[in-house]
């Protein structure tokens, strides 16, 4: 196996990397130069661009949880800017590294959305969106016709988002990972 082939690190490479990290100075010990440094606030541009993907505003009510992580403020700001009514799950809105309301803070784990679903039911939400603590993944749950809630799989969520964008005439490429469904490819082919 060679470089950049997507394999898990094994011995002895893992130990060599750990040694190199341990030998490196801490980030605050590295001298920095102010020359040629420009601070760029990308938040506003990101929010504007993401809001453009939604287009028209909606009367959808979203229950949102960051599971004690960092995504609550930005997620709420973005979804509100898009015209959605957003209600944070209050018990999980503030970052807390102890994750006191979940046994394991992964929104894809069984039981992790229980508090969010309860909040969604209380406010009459149309959907629950749950971020993982570092906000690089999310899960969604929706009410069913019988009144219960159903957590969508990542493949289902991706397909719904892809279909939504394709129906709106979005251009560009759809991509999926090796472990995700090929349904996005079929959606793209259907819409040309």
Spans of model-derived segments:
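Gly/Ser/Thr-enriched, mixed-charge loops and adjacent short helices
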Residues: 1-120
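Proline/glycine-rich low-complexity loops and linkers
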Residues: 12-13, 19-43, 144-192
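Short glycine/threonine-rich loop-to-helix capping motif typified by GTGT followed
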Residues: 70-77, 142-144, 189-190
